[in-house]
């Protein structure tokens, strides 16, 4: 089974926290998708990554990494997120039937807290994503409303399912 990591889980530290035995297969992209940052629904306490495929994403590519993993992870639910299926075009020339998480109801455009955000540019650099793409993601981040408590600490060293524990 394949997971498409496009946001915080690009950082080796984060993917290992949530899927310790996941193995990277290839870098790739999801056509007509883009990485956005939004609050969850009506909440305004923080932003999260969102894997958008609305009209604004037409013609864009969300870059990421295909990870092979134990199927048990497909059953893991997190507050405010749903699993979605996506075809990923791998840099190895193959296509992959993947799944990933996205917000169920994206609210206003809002930045995530710093502890969360830092995994994104770190991961993109670890995977040698193009500087142009990294700058594009930075611009999306900069255009979003500030996180009310951007400096809040990571609430848990051990990931939980509830929004309060992440």
Describe the role of every protein-language-model region.
Residues 1-166:
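Glycine-aromatic micro-motifs
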């Amino acid at each position: 089974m394949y997971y498409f990591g496009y946001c915080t889980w690009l950082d080796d530290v984060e993917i290992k926290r949530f899927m310790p035995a996941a193995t990277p297969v290839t870098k790739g992209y999801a056509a007509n998708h883009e990485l956005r940052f939004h609050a969850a629904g009506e909440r305004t306490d923080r932003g999260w990554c969102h894997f958008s495929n609305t009209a604004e994403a037409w013609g864009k590519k969300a870059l990421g990494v295909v990870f092979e993993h134990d199927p048990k992870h497909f059953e893991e639910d997190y507050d405010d997120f749903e699993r979605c299926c996506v075809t990923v075009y791998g840099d190895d020339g193959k296509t992959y039937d993947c799944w990933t998480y996205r917000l169920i109801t994206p609210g206003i455009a809002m930045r995530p807290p710093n502890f969360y955000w830092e995994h994104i540019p770190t991961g993109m650099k670890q995977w040698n994503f193009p500087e142009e793409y990294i700058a594009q993601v930075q611009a999306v981040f900069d255009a979003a409303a500030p996180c009310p408590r951007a400096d809040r600490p990571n609430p848990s060293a051990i990931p939980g399912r509830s929004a309060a524990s992440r």
